[in-house]
Design a protein with these regions (language model features):
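A cross-family acyltransferase "interaction/gating" segment
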Residues: 16, 24-95, 99
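A cross-taxonomic marker for long C-terminal extensions/tails that follow the last structured domain
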Residues: 87-121
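Membrane-interfacial amphipathic helices and adjacent loop/beta segments
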Residues: 1-15
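Alpha-helix C-cap/termination motif
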Residues: 10-13, 48, 107
Length: 121
């Protein structure tokens, strides 16, 4: 719970916090299910009074299993406001976030010259 409190304090003090909403990173190119942690953390931080912006990001490497010094691309989608999901469930939030992340990942895959089916479900 220390890490959760620390994350909320980072957000409250207007620092940026990077979270992989899947809970981990995959090295085999397979999609992971989004966890509930990002939504819950953002809601906790929002209770402290600060508006919360979520910035979906897609990352792609030259190879499905990255090698040392491989190239990569990171594409950043338009931020959205947590308040837009004030009355939404975790599943509704994650559905929207996943679609934003997938858009960013497609753009990143194109940037590194990989086929779209290398990464998509």
């Amino acid at each position: 719970l220390f890490s959760l409190r620390y994350a909320v304090e980072l957000i409250y003090s207007k620092n940026q916090l990077v979270i992989f909403p899947e809970g981990k990173i995959t090295t085999n190119g397979k999609k992971l299910k989004l966890k509930q942690g990002l939504f819950r953390l953002a809601k906790l931080a929002r209770k402290k009074g600060e508006p919360i912006k979520i910035v979906p990001v897609g990352i792609a490497y030259d190879n499905v299993k990255p090698k040392f010094r491989d190239g990569f691309a990171m594409c950043i989608e338009k931020p959205f406001d947590l308040d837009d999901f004030a009355n939404s469930s975790v599943d509704e939030f994650n559905f929207y976030l996943k679609s934003c992340i997938q858009e960013a990942e497609v753009k990143a895959l194109i940037q590194v010259g990989r086929k779209l089916d290398d990464q998509l479900e």
